[in-house]
């Protein structure tokens, strides 16, 4: 089982979209996948199902009550399950940090009885306790970066945090690559930012994926329709972008 976190401290970079399409794409390739929505905004959950009612088993219950992942997961379709997000996790740092819940997700994985080929975690756009829990269990991290704006500050902060995680756990957490999203080869901005993204990749000891994810309205349309992109718009250029990216990722992690 390979655990992949999709993370960036900056919002609006295609983090959740990447987690959703990656999960669906891996399932389409015959892998069994578990998605975990660790972002209190619950956008990954909303990509696949209506807003859950209060009391629906969620990731919050893993942290607050020690529920297992098997107890809280929801089946989306064959070979694709989801641990839904929860707005209650907005106060996770205040509620759980003092309670010693820094390794709750690790404990939950040790108790996981179901078998998966991949776990994809959508992390919050911050480096609080939810992201730290995700990093502690992850084998790989994907960092989406929008080609319309960029700052190295967040990358430096992510690097510092990952170094601390490795020091704490003595486990190497690999940033498998930076993924350029919202890309347009028609604009100078996208082309000019590529150099900065390469600098960010060097800082994180990784490489930029060759794949470029174009900006496209079908991304939002598929999320509103609660249909994964591969089914909603299989022939759209951005779908091809993501398919190429997934193949590149699998090759990079030698699957």
Model-inferred region functions:
Residues 1-255:
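P-loop NTP-binding core
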């Amino acid at each position: 089982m390979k655990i992949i976190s999709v993370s960036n401290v900056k919002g609006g970079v295609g983090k959740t979209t990447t987690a959703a399409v990656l999960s669906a794409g891996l399932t389409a390739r015959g892998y069994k996948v578990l998605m975990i929505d660790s972002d209190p905004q619950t956008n990954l959950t909303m990509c696949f199902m209506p807003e859950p009612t209060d009391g629906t088993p969620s990731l919050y219950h893993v942290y607050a009550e020690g529920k297992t992942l098997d107890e809280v997961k929801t089946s989306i379709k064959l070979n694709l399950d989801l641990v839904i997000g929860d707005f209650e996790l907005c106060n996770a740092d205040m509620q759980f940090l003092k309670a010693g819940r820094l390794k709750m997700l690790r404990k939950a994985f040790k108790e996981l009885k179901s078998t998966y080929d991949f776990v994809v975690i959508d992390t919050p756009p911050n480096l609080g306790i939810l992201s730290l829990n995700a990093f502690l269990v992850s084998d790989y991290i994907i960092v989406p970066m929008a080609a319309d704006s960029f700052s190295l500050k967040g990358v430096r902060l992510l690097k510092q945090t990952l170094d601390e995680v490795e020091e704490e756990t003595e486990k190497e957490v690999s940033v498998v690559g930076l993924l350029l999203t919202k890309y347009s080869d028609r604009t100078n901005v996208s082309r000019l930012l590529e150099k900065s993204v390469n600098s960010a990749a060097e800082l994180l000891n990784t490489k930029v994926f060759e794949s470029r994810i174009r900006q496209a309205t079908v991304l939002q349309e598929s999320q509103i329709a609660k249909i994964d992109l591969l089914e909603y718009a299989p022939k759209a250029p951005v779908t091809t972008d993501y398919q190429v990216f997934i193949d590149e990722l699998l090759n990079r992690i030698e699957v």
